[in-house]
Each structure stands twice: as C-alpha cells, then as structure tokens.
Amino acid sequence: MGLRTPLYELHVALGAKMVDFGGWDMPLHYGSQVEEHHQVRRDCGVFDVSHMTVVDVAGEQATAYLQHLLANDVARLGETGKALYSAMLNEEGGVVDDLIVYLTEHGYRVVVNASTRDKDIAWMQAQAAGFKVDLQERGDLAMLAIQGPNARVHSSELVSPARAALIRELKPFQGRAEGDWFIARTGYTGEDGLEIMLPAAEAPGFLNELVGAGISPAGLGARDTLRLEAGLNLYGQDMDESVSPLAANMGWTVAWEPVARDFVGRRALEAQKAAGDQPKLVGLVLEERGVLRAHQVVRVAGIGEGEITSGSFSPTLNKSIALARVPAATGDRAEVEIRGKWYPVRVVQPSFVRHGKPLI
C-alpha cells in the first residue's frame, strides 16, 4: 500500500482506477481518460494534487537563501502574491527539481514535486546552512487543481464571498491567502485555472461540492496528456539531475542578472552557455499513424541522434506528439524509430496547445 492523500476514499467512491505514482496511490482516471482531457480543455475538471510537497520559507534571510537556492531570482516577484517558476540545480548544473515559489505576506511558499519529496527536502535543508531561515513542510494541507476555461467561474460559485472575490481578482501566476486557504491562478494543463491549498480536513467536503456541481474529477492520465500538449516538462522524464535547464527548454527560467548572484550551479551553466554545445528540447509531430513514446530514438539526417523524453497521442490534435532532446543544429524534420521502422516527424516548438487552441 502506498501513501494516500486525504481524498483517497473519495476517489475510490467515485470509481477511480488507482495506480502508484512516486509512492502515492493516485487516480489514473475515473472512466474515460480522453473524456477527462476534453472536459478540461472545453469546460473544467478537478485534480487531486495533494501529493505535491508544500514548504513555507520564512526568516530574515529567506530572500537571500532562495536567491542562492534557485536558478531564477525571487527578487523578480516584486509584490506579495506573485509566483515564479524555477529550478533547483546541483553544482554540475543538473536539475534537482522544478518548482513554483510564491511571495506571501509571511515569506515564501514553495511547491515541489511529489516523487522527489525526500531528496528535495534534504537538498533545501542542506543549502540552508549559514542562512537565518526557517523551512516548514506543510503536511497539514491538501491541494486541488481546478483547471479549464470555466474553472474560475464555476469555482467562485461554491466558495465564500471573500474567496470568490479573490478568485475574480487574481491575475495569471498570482496566489494569495484568504483565511486558511491559499488560492493561486496557476496550473499544469495549458488552460486557465486554480490551484487551491486548504486544510486537509476540508478537502473531501470541497471536492464533493465541486463534483456535485458538475465539475468532473480527472486523473493522472489526463493530466499527463494535457501537460504534454502544453509543452510542460515532467520531472524524471524531460529533465533530471543529469540534464541542464539549457537542454530542457528552461533557459528562460535562469536569471543571469545580477552577475553577483552566485546561485547553485551558476558556474556550470556559464561554462555550458559559453561552450554552446547543449542539445535542445523540441516538439515532434507524427503525421502518419502510430504513437510516439518516451525513449524512442530520433534520427536527424547529417547531424546525429536524439531521444524522445515524453510522447503520447494528443486528444486535442488527434495525432501523436512528443518532446525530444535532439542536437542543437536540428532543423524542422527528423525521423523516429517505431518498432524497427523509421517514420518522418515534423520538428516544432515544444508547445502544441494553449488555451484550447492548436499552436502547430
């Protein structure tokens, strides 16, 4: 038996197929994964993401600590409520994990991945040496992601007037507390939506209200195809500790200025940048029948080979798509080996669908 979120019993009651994910028993789907995917793209759906790790960072040197820990710069946040996407790097420039950090009234809130919890907490604690900072893991919270073009409208109808007002006011990539709830306009689907952190004891009741109001529960299967269509990386597949953010389409998350900010992994990244020899993460589109899968070989004529990191059938585009790490000189055409046969693929920017609209 794996770890269970506060919503486990409710998932079972709703007919979810439960699977192991990073040591957690999580819903894969509640019937039709494809229908759950379409529901999020066209209206909205709700995901249990309570397995994610939430850490509050406070203390007089909290800002300096995070400026050391993260490749992106929390000084960019500017005002309470703003959010920032970043990576934690090791000294070799590899990605320890990717995360979102919010500037709160009392410090910062960091949300990291579930499958990397133990190593992330250990890394954050090790890097805190020498800083006057307090790290508090918030195991008392559950987290629901309500995603889709109508997510905010439907959600605001089910909460208190103060929380509804906050939902209406939030701009993309903002998150603020209202009582003991923390409501953020963030997500992992390429659609508008909310991620709500609330006391674990209140989560089953709120999920019941959402489902009762017609908001469909969605599982890990739909979450994966949605994030792939949006071109959003999955840690452990599209990047890990052996991969530089420069080779994972995450170069935009590295804050090079100010030059004096010596974040972990900076020197390694500077050397990689100067050498200019890092591969790149691209999108692939299979125009023929077949399915692109992780670890399939990508061949670029006259240049070299790469590998698919994430691949699946796209319900929105009705064709197979993938993210792949390929040589930097790769153009707009390549081939992928599927069951011993080579198939032509189109090379595109690593983002296929945003806000329900195809980008390819």
Curated annotation (Swiss-Prot):
Pfam families: GCV_T, GCV_T_C
An annotated GO cellular component: glycine cleavage complex
Domain of life: Bacteria
Reactions catalysed according to its record: N(6)-[(R)-S(8)-aminomethyldihydrolipoyl]-L-lysyl-[protein] + (6S)-5,6,7,8-tetrahydrofolate = N(6)-[(R)-dihydrolipoyl]-L-lysyl-[protein] + (6R)-5,10-methylene-5,6,7,8-tetrahydrofolate + NH4(+)
Sample GO molecular function, one term: transaminase activity
Entry's EC annotation: 2.1.2.10
UniProt KW keywords: Aminotransferase, Transferase
Broad class of enzyme this protein falls into: transferase
Gene Ontology BP term (one): glycine decarboxylation via glycine cleavage system
Family: Belongs to the GcvT family.
Quaternary assembly: The glycine cleavage system is composed of four proteins: P, T, L and H.
Entry function: The glycine cleavage system catalyzes the degradation of glycine.
Record-given protein name: Aminomethyltransferase
Gene symbol of the encoding locus: gcvT
